[in-house]
Amino acid sequence: MPPPPHIKPENVLKRAQELIAVGQAPAALNVLHEHVTSKRTRSSPISSLEPVMLQIVELCVDMRKGKAAKDGLYQYKNIAQNTNVGTIEVVLKKFIELAEKKVTEAQTKADEIQSSLESAAPSANVEDLEAIETPETILLATVSGEQSRDRTDRAVVTPWLKFLWETYRTVLEILKNNARLEVMYQTTALQAFQFCLKYTRKTEFRRLCELLRNHVQNAAKYSAQMHAINLSDPDTLQRHLDTRFQQLNVAVELELWQEAFRSIEDIHTLLSLSKRPAKNVMMANYYEKLARIFLVSENYLFHAAAWSRYYNLLRQSAATLAAGQGTKKENPSVTEADMTKAASFVLLSALAIPVISTSRSRGALVDVDEVRKNKNTRLTNLLGMAQPPTRAVLFKDAMNKGLLKRARPEIRELYNILEVDFHPLSICKKITPILKQIGSDPEMEKYVVPLQQVILTRLFQQLSQVYESVELKFVYELAQFPDPFQITPAMIEKFIMNGCKKGDLAIRVDHISGVLTFDSDVFSSAKALHPGSAAGSAESEVGSVQRLQNTPAEIARLQLTRLAKTLHVSCMYVDPSYNESRIQAKQTAQARALAGAAKEHEETLARRVIIEKKKEAATDALQRKQREEETRKRIRTQQLQEAEKQRLLDEQREREKKRIKDEQDRIRQQELKKQLEELKSGVKGIDINEIDLQDLDANRLRAMKLAQLEKEKNELNDRIRTTGKRIDHLERAFRREELKHIPEDYEAQKKRDMEIYEATKAETLKEAELKHKEAVALKHRLSRLVPHFNSFRKEVSEKRHEEFEKRRKAAERDFEAKKKQRVKEVQERRRREKMEREMAERQRKEEEERAQREEEEKRARDEERRRVLAEEKAKREEERKRLDEIAAKQKQREEEAEARRAARKAGLEPAAPAARPEPTERTAPRLNIAPRTGGPSWRERQAAKEAAGGAAPEAAPKEEAPQPARRPGGYVPPHLRSGSSAAPAAPPSNGAPERYVPRHARESSSSQPPSRTQTPGSDKPSEGGSAGKWVPRWKQQQNQ
């Protein structure tokens, strides 16, 4: 069976309205729901689908069908989000508006039902809308028959409250993580917060917060989707921040402190992601709510730190507004009263920080625990502080900012009593009026109990410094507070036991004798509170308590310290050299530090430059990577969009083809049925029952119909012709009878017409005569007024002419004045333009002269630089030539030494030395410090040479080996300066002592390896016949 043809949305809506009109709302909803969830609906235009969705929403709200509404809205969002986002917002707003309207109507109905009850009766307070009926309520409804307010609200209002809550949740699920529907998502979240606040829905508020938190966490997971939100976008992040701040405000109003703290963490996470700084008004709200949360959790240290941050923000906002650098919309409005109130709370909250730990376990052990450290680190990060706050640091910060002058007088006096001039014997008397003033203020009343704990701690700490034991009665008398805040002896003993349990106090209570004994173990170590402890005091006992005198334990513990200090002072007086050496060492260290400071500073600057360059490179790489990622993502998104668009176009094209084909088939079938019905009812003479309808088509039916119509037409023409003949005979008879009575009728008609004419003529003449008489009378009456009218008109004309002349002259005067003014302005403008042109010309000339002067200076600098470079180049050439001469001399000396060694080895006298040029530079003479070995000295040999007349046996002539190529201007090693078969050079002629050569060098001088620029077989063959082939050094030694 083929699928049913697609029905247009207009027809579906019309059918649903018809069903609603006859009371079939569920059937209408079913029809609309099936149409919207059908795949064929995707090709329908959005403008025709929107009324269908609005009707579905109305029916779902009326029947409380949240599941059907959710399915339809999801399908509609998938259809419309790529083309028209506004229609989705319209439908969802309508959905929420109808649900809220139903809740209001339900409340009105419940009020009408309970109009006979007392107006002050408690309202319904169902803890969980998803668990309305509990076993207890069912049993109570069964046993009790009375209709109470709670039962009425539970039966009438609560179901609609549950439906409204499901509506908000459904809308948020539909709009989540969609950048196009982001504004609507934030608006719906704010409406849901207001719903929870208005109806005090604490359970639903927790679920709502968890739902929004999951949406943000899943945003990164689904970031690759087509319309996913981007938390890196400042506007998106700002909207989420606004939502979280509203969530924080509602949580504080509902007193859900855990949810408020989690909202604070969400805000801190979003602020860490934000690239733009948060507004001061938002941060002020942030710190204010955070202070309230810490106060409820009795974390007085971080409560005071939050107040301190809030006060700093108010000061910054006031300074910004005073300097005119910010707007009132972004900065909280601050007055002097607000600053005084904030300063008072900062100081009071700091005073309320416990000096010792207030937790039930041992403070020292808990503070070391890793969980406690992590918690304190988290709280410190939430406050935006670099390190955990302490009581001493908060007081120091408050004093530096002058909070003591801004605070209220009683708070200032309380600070002086507790921190500056604490006296245990009179503390309660001094503080009683102050506590009464603080207790009278509802906002400050919460600090009375922690202040009592601080006072008791100070009291016992200072009593332990003075007394070893005191009576309980005496302690009870000292700890007397005003009446509303009176402390009983049991509370004091509980405080003592708690302090002893944690190790903060060392007190024993003897109830028999009624005495308090302070522990005075001289070998006990004083406990130092751990930084960041739960109590909040990170200061040592010495810094937090006014020292009256040292305890025996401190005296025993500090004995070695005092002894060392005394010995140090004695050594300084007894041995002056000790002090001098200490001062000298200090001065040496200072000099060394000063000497290395400049270098260290330069290294630090260099490291800073390197770090900045690395940071810039990392930032550039990160930005480049982000740009590439964004480009890839944008290209991928465009490709996906194009592919999706092409797919939708293909599907729409296929659906259109199929729809046209189905429509053609349907029209063909309907036409066939219609023709059959016409043949059956309209055309006579054809028996349809005898026709085979299976083989019948439109052409055959049309031919049958035309044949039958032609037959009927012929029959009709025959009947008309017969009837016409009959009518012609009757008409001819009627006219023959009328001819007899026509003359009589003509005479009667003529007489009636003459009578009517005479009557009309007489009446017309009478009316004309009457009108003439009336016109003549009117002329006589008006003729008397003509002179007066003419004089009046002349008068008015003269006045108007005079007025016109006055106005014309005034206009001419104004024209002349404005003309003169215009001429003056034009002259002034031309003069000003001329001056500007002259000034511009002068500036241009000055600029050209300056440019010419700079060009000449630049040319002179270039000439000077070229001259300097030429001089430096000449100096380098001279230096290179000098080095070449030195290298040549060195080479010559080495060749002479090698020649002497070769001659000495051969047992021959050295040949006459070649003439050697005198050195151009003076060098120190070489000294032969080696001892004589029995041979003649060089002087003896020189004398023998002179006696022989300078003649010497010539060495056998040998072919001179080709000199190796030498690199210009560089050092040439000895083995590259001469070939292995070269003859030894003659010794120098000036008689300079030869250079010492090691034995292994002398032995291997005759078998020098080939130079690096020669091949092993490049040398000419020597006399020994061994120069044609390269032989390793070790093999040459073996051959020798």
Curated annotation (Swiss-Prot):
Pfam families: eIF3a_PCI_TPR-like (PF22591), PCI (PF01399). Its main location: cytoplasm. Residues 617-641, 795-1040 are annotated as: Disordered. GO terms for cellular component: cytoplasmic stress granule; eukaryotic 43S preinitiation complex; eukaryotic 48S preinitiation complex; eukaryotic translation initiation factor 3 complex, eIF3e; eukaryotic translation initiation factor 3 complex, eIF3m; multi-eIF complex. Keywords: Coiled coil, Cytoplasm, Initiation factor, Protein biosynthesis, RNA-binding. It is found in: Cytoplasm. InterPro entries: EIF3A, eIF3a_PCI_TPR-like, PCI_dom. Residues 339-523 form the PCI domain. One of its GO terms (molecular function) is translation initiation factor activity. Disulfide bonds: none annotated. One of its GO terms (biological process) is formation of cytoplasmic translation initiation complex. Residues 908-917, 945-955, 978-993, 1004-1018 have a biased composition (Low complexity). Residues 617-632, 795-901 have a biased composition (Basic and acidic residues). Residues 92-121, 608-906 form a coiled coil. The keyword Protein biosynthesis applies. Component of the eukaryotic translation initiation factor 3 (eIF-3) complex. RNA-binding component of the eukaryotic translation initiation factor 3 (eIF-3) complex, which is involved in protein synthesis of a specialized repertoire of mRNAs and, together with other initiation factors, stimulates binding of mRNA and methionyl-tRNAi to the 40S ribosome. The eIF-3 complex specifically targets and initiates translation of a subset of mRNAs involved in cell proliferation. Belongs to the eIF-3 subunit A family. This is Eukaryotic translation initiation factor 3 subunit A. It comes from Aspergillus terreus (strain NIH 2624 / FGSC A1156).
